[in-house]
Amino acid sequence: MALLHIPLNQIEEQHILELIATRAPETNIIEYKRETYGHSLRDDLEFLADVSSLANTSGGDLIIGFAATQGIPEETVPFTGDFDAEINRLEGRARAGLQPRISLESRAVAVQGGHILILRVARSYNPPHRIIRENSNRFWARSTAGKYEPNVDQLRELFTLAPRIADQTREFRTTRLIRIASGDAPVTLMHKDVLVLHVVPFSAFDRDAPLPMAELERDYMSFHPIGSRQSQALKINFDGFLAMSNGDRAANVERAYVQLFRGGIVEAVDGLYARASGEPLIPVVQVERNIAGHAMRLMRDLAAIGIEPPYAVLASLLTAEKARFNFAHPGDGAWYDRMGSYTDRPQYAFGEVIFDSAPANVQGCAQRMRPLLDQLAQSGGMAESVSFRSDGTFVTGR
């Protein structure tokens, strides 16, 4: 038994006591410490080795305040000092002593006699993390037997993880675009010319994430299609979970859909063109708002069902019919003065943007995605996105 399946902010004393009652042993994802770490250089190096070994392998919980014999917890030895100050001290040590930095969360769980400190280390998708304290330059990994220093071959494997994930993400996008363009989407689309948005958790290629199907099939607000306030129809399918924009099942066509794959990857597709005097137009400003706003919502929806960051966000346009980019803001009466160039290819696949955490708001999301949005504008002949003011603020509406 471990605690990783329980959100850190929901862990209570009963969960702590269950570890003792079930004699849950130390593994590659859980380590017990009787006392917190001291203040000497040796103590710092031990702490950094412990947390970096978790980050470089599978992630896990470092639990301070357990007396254990041969890795089996026997009793709690609660921390009785200022737990906020101690957590801040340890988090500061991790920030200053490792490169690159790791993702670390902490919680003090109240128990009889004091607190148990839990440091939750996320599995890193940018390994390996090395100890830079006093120029140590050492790497650590972890197995069921404890932490160890990886050999050359193991280090090489760690160094290639991030590029491998990038390649898998791009390959997934390419495969999906081919299928959608050929008519092999999970629904029959109303239009062939579409915006395709992918949100790819880095964990997606490790394992299939267990999706909460029973909850999803009752939730019309999460993972809803672009351009809709909520889903109009929901369906469990072979690939995972499908949300659709059309509530009329007899119509059998969809303007937009969201496919949540079992690994946690999300694909959101929406009709792209607007038409004026019969000419198909790409309303760039509205497309940019759709990308930023929906990417933010999808990342937050993923986090809510336990599929954690980092996430790669990718946006693409499928433009089977020749169209013209238009840079008018919604409601701008002089839209015909805001024309850009014509499309010159059937597909635009813009560069991915990496998020280490789900953005708190559309502003933060759009600013992070500025390079992608600029690339979209440049595809239509504009030097940069027209959705940002001179101070960098993203224009969300008028």
Model-based region annotation:
Residues K33-G38, I72-T80, E134-G146, S277-L281:
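Short hinge/gating elements
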